[in-house]
Regions:
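N-terminal Rossmann-fold NAD(P) dinucleotide-binding loop
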Residues: 13
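Nucleotide donor/acceptor-binding cores
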Residues: 2, 25, 159
């Protein structure tokens, strides 16, 4: 029997395992992918972080991860002195945030972090397995059945089961009460929720990212994708031009904006408002010795796929959606290589080369798609817009302060276009807390969400889904499972009984160095988010 079984090897799963191990409880990670880390590694998405991340607003273990990434570059790359000596080294100088790094580096660093705990037998990892069933007895899960790509199955018995998958795989097989898609205003009372009925199909777009480099004077054009003709002229009704193009819909105003691959000059803020610099994860200018090329991650607005929702249909629908998302990315690459207007005149960038070394794949595409939302538990407490949204909290100067806080985070409610045909929704939010009640399912006693499956709504998921918050949620979940085992209590009892809650929060703050409340900071408005505008000082 395994004490803590973590289904999913993403950031939340890694953080959960690390927390449980640090508290002395052995655990098992069941990872569908051979790379652990999820969005930061196998999905090839560099960190989406808030403006204060270098000072506060993350757990000590997440800060340690960030430091180790920077140390990896200092130890292994020929950095110029100015870059090497910068405490807040940003390997890629990407506009997305202060730490844009290569996906494979994140994976290696995470492996290094877990290595001593694996050596001690406190963490075990099974790779290439996915939840396929569960044995539920009463209000407890006794075991999960996992299956690999060859159809081989095995049963895993445990005390606590954590769902750290993007889609909520454990929630499905264990029949945990959950929600998909967008809730209605009648259900949640949220200011920006749907005014009509709830829409399970209203699921955010997924993105199949890829890594790219430039090899001047070479021809790297990929074979013409089978679906290229379809995607070449594809234009949703709310988009300002064909998706295979340089016009995008502004994430806040929905006005048309020109976003080419490259620009010759920066804008008035000093940043290049182009695609190449958006998620650049390695900047050649920071390397000695004539480094051949930058490396950038293509995970751009025009690459969002939402035609078929991943959830609510059948297995064939999901498989088709994933295949189409990958084909859409290939089509965008082919368009850039052959037909795209160039910043220096002419058409096509044949010198664009997929960089599989960064993603661990032969074609340069990420190992896994970036999935923004999946199943969310029906929780004892659900975080709604009125807890964190600026417009939804008139006259208040911060987010809701939760008695049962188990961590903190910050991001705007950033919703990408959805499968129901809705455009982006981007809402100001206050730096927020993670309530323990959002980690407790309404029925099952030994299932804990360890990431995006927590008790949020369609709206608040848009803020709680990002890297440092997923890490913090997973860390709290792993600590909760360990605490309940050692204290012979349950998650619900831990929350409901004041002395138990205070004891658990003391474990979080003293043994794991997790902040439970924010200092006072301003709201995350369009001028206070990393992206393509300068961030204002706090």
């Amino acid at each position: 029997m395994k004490r803590v079984v973590i289904v999913g090897g993403g950031l939340g799963g890694v953080a959960a395992a690390l927390a449980a191990a640090r508290l002395g409880v052995p655990c098992l990670i069941i990872s569908e992918c051979d790379w652990i880390g999820g969005q930061i590694s196998s999905q090839a998405i560099p960190p989406d972080e808030h403006p204060w991340i270098e000072m506060t607003g993350s757990t000590a273990s997440y800060r340690s991860f960030r430091k180790r990434v920077r140390d990896f570059y200092r130890s292994n790359y020929p950095l110029i002195a100015a870059a090497r000596n910068k405490e807040a080294l940003n390997p890629g100088l990407g506009n997305i945030g202060p730490l844009a790094h290569e996906p494979f580096v994140a994976e290696m660093v995470l492996e290094q972090i877990l290595a001593p705990w694996r050596s001690r037998g406190l963490i075990e990892i099974l790779r290439g397995w996915k939840a396929a069933g569960a044995d539920v007895q009463g209000d407890r899960v006794r075991s999960v059945t996992i299956r690999n790509s060859e159809g081989v199955e095995q049963e895993i018995v445990g005390d606590y089961f954590l769902d750290a998958t993007d889609l909520g795989d454990l929630l499905e097989v264990a029949e945990v009460e959950h929600v998909i898609g967008a809730e209605s205003q009648a259900q949640t009372g949220e200011l920006h929720a749907l005014q009509g009925p709830a829409d399970p199909r209203d699921q955010q777009a997924i993105t199949w990212a890829m890594a790219l480099r430039l090899s001047p004077h070479t021809d790297n054009v990929i074979p013409r994708p089978a679906q290229y003709d379809r995607w070449r002229t594809y234009q949703p009704h709310f988009w300002p031009g064909p998706m295979l193009g340089w016009q995008v819909s502004d994430y806040v105003t929905h006005e048309s904006r020109y976003r080419p691959l490259m620009l010759n000059e920066p804008d008035s803020s000093g940043l290049f408002y182009d695609l190449w610099h958006a998620r650049r994860v390695l900047a050649a200018e920071q390397m000695e010795g004539g480094w051949e090329s930058d490396t950038t991650i293509a995970a751009w607005p025009m690459m969002d796929y939402w035609e078929i929702p991943l959830l609510g249909g059948n297995t064939n629908d999901t498989a088709k959606a994933l295949q189409e998302a990958k084909e859409f990315t290939r089509s965008f690459l082919y368009w850039m290589q052959t037909e795209a207007p160039r910043h220096d005149g002419g058409t096509g960038y044949p010198e664009l080369r997929p960089h599989g070394e960064a993603t661990g794949t032969p074609d340069g595409l990420a190992k896994m798609p970036y999935i923004r939302e999946g199943r969310r538990i029906q929780a004892d407490f659900t975080v709604v817009e009125e807890h964190i949204g600026v417009a939804a909290r008139p006259g208040k100067a911060g987010a809701e302060r939760f008695r049962d806080s188990v961590g903190i985070g910050a991001y705007r409610m950033d919703l990408h276009p959805s499968s129901s045909g809705r455009n982006t929704l981007d809402l100001d939010s206050w730096p927020f807390e993670i309530p323990l009640g959002a980690l407790i399912p309404v029925r099952l006693n030994n299932v804990i969400p360890a990431g995006k499956t927590m008790g949020t709504t369609h709206l608040t998921n848009g803020a709680y889904r990002v890297h440092p918050v997923e890490w913090a949620t997973g860390e709290a979940a792993g600590a909760l499972a360990a605490y309940c085992l050692q204290s012979k209590t349950t998650p619900r009892e831990t929350r409901d009984q004041d002395f138990q809650l205070e004891d658990f929060q003391s474990v979080l703050s003293t043994r794991l160095d997790i902040d439970l409340h924010w200092p006072e900071f301003g709201a995350l408005t369009p001028l206070r988010r990393f992206g393509y505008v300068q961030t204002a000082a706090s």
